[in-house]
């Protein structure tokens, strides 16, 4: 830990890492698992396409927009409001993630910190399975097989971008990747959300701040 990290954050991190050190966790494996499920689903969906009509590509775009809304709603709702039925989400996100990483201490330090950034491993598998079932048993009979494959690909692509951009946002401030203007913007966008006074009010989208614009919760850093 560096001297620039507030004492309260250092204390929280020490206590959390003491618990984490008692568990078997490898951040590298967590990332590989996430990539295997999400990239695997995307590749499978694209390989299954056959004679795609131009109009069917709209389901890929629609999935990206729909997942952006789901991300916004889930982040602004259950992740920041202690609803009794899903209080665990609030605990893990607001009480742990937002106290492990604040706007004054955004960066992770090693692979074990990935546990505080990535969704749990089971979530990657559940999303892929759900999207492939939706593709097969809803889109294919109701619209077309291509529509289903493109929707599933778009949904998994958005989730993949979410995870990768979230990891990126917790890189060191001076990382050269932030010289790319859109990535620097997304990093600052998320850093503002990590300000404790703002975390339940602004900047709920991470990968694509579309619905922060729609619902007027976009705040510049």
What are these regions (language model features)?
Residues 1-41:
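Cytosolic-side membrane-entry/anchor segment at the start of a transmembrane helix
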Residues 14, 54-62, 150-153, 180-181:
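Short hydrophobic/aromatic segments of transmembrane alpha-helices and their interfaces
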Residues 29-36, 57-60, 125, 147, ...:
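Alpha-helical transmembrane segments
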Residues 30-48, 121-138:
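Hydrophobic core of alpha-helical transmembrane segments in multi-pass integral membrane proteins
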Residues 43-59, 136-150:
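Helix-coil boundary and interhelical linker segments in multi-pass alpha-helical membrane proteins
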Residues 58-74:
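N-terminal signal-anchor transmembrane alpha helix
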Residues 69-152, 156-221:
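Membrane-embedded catalytic scaffold of the fatty acid hydroxylase/desaturase
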């Amino acid at each position: 830990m560096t001297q620039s990290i507030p004492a309260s954050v250092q204390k929280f991190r020490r206590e959390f890492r003491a618990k984490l050190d008692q568990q078997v966790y490898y951040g590298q494996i967590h990332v590989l698992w996430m990539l295997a499920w999400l990239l695997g689903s995307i590749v499978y969906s694209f390989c299954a396409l056959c004679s795609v009509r131009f109009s069917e590509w709209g389901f890929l775009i629609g999935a990206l927009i729909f997942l952006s809304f789901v991300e916004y709603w889930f982040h602004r709702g259950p992740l920041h409001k202690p609803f009794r039925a899903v209080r665990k989400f609030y605990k893990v996100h607001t009480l742990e993630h937002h106290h492990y990483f604040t706007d004054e201490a955004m960066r992770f330090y090693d692979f074990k910190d990935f546990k505080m950034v990535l969704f749990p491993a089971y979530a990657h598998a559940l999303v892929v399975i759900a999207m492939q079932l939706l593709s097969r048993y809803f889109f294919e009979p109701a619209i077309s097989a291509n529509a289903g494959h493109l929707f599933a690909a778009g949904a998994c692509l958005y989730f993949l971008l979410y995870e990768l951009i979230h990891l990126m946002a917790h890189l060191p401030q001076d990382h050269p990747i932030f010289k790319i203007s859109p990535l620097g913007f997304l990093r600052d966008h998320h850093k503002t959300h990590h300000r404790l006074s703002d975390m339940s009010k602004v900047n709920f989208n991470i990968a694509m701040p579309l619905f922060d614009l729609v619902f007027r919760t976009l705040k510049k850093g």
